[in-house]
Amino acid sequence: MPNRNKSIFITSYKRERILLLLLKRLKDNLNYNQFNKLVIIQNGSKKLIKLIKKIDHDIRIIETNYSDKYSKFSKVNNNVFLGFKKCFEYYNSEFVIHLEDDCIPSYDFLNFFNEIYLRYKDDKKFYAINAFSKEFKLDKKFTYSKFIYGIGKGWGIPKEKWIFTKEKLKNILSSNIKKYFDSHLEWKIKKKYYVIMPYRSRVIEIPTNGLNFKIKDKNKKFYKDWKRSFLKSKKCLIEKYQYDPHMKYYWRKDCLKYNFYNKIIIYFKSFFK
């Protein structure tokens, strides 16, 4: 296998059909061959592994199984920790992306992450790149901005932030923990760093009655907006990604623009968290 300095890993649990669709969409990405690929399968099957290898024989696979004493939170957290640890410490990656198996990537998903990482990798305040959004304007396909927010639904971090992330994630790996990694990390990220968000979404979550979105949620306005925002068409030529410091973003009310005023607000709010 050729030497690659970037990786993407997918965590998967009982969503085989969507996982295979995800991998096929990912393989269509422009920068696909520049990334190591790892799939962490919880309670998987030999049949599924064969189907994954049929898509790409070079995809690495790790199988996990947990006893009943582990909470659903702890299983998710351990799988995520394992993925980052493997990619950073064994594959020696400079940048690592995590996707859950129900998040379908856009046609420029890897290109977006790659370009933004190269642009901000030397900024000590840069923590992560997120892939999600629910905004929509035709002329904003390749716009992004900086925000004081957490991570989730397709996110990537540089190696320099792995030490910080590793230390914080270790606190939620015990078997009886009842908190997911993204909510655990949120305020720790907000206090020190910014994250980058695209105006148009680079992922769409498929409702599956999983941990977050239920099948019934596909009819809600939030999900319809997210689906509209998703950059799914392959007909659009990839353009240069443009930073917009004034970009409006409404994923959640607490997703704040990265500026001096909001940093002060977050600093004082953090004492009550």
List where the protein language model places each region:
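Peripheral/terminal regions associated with large enzymatic or DNA-binding modules
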Residues: 2-99, 103-273
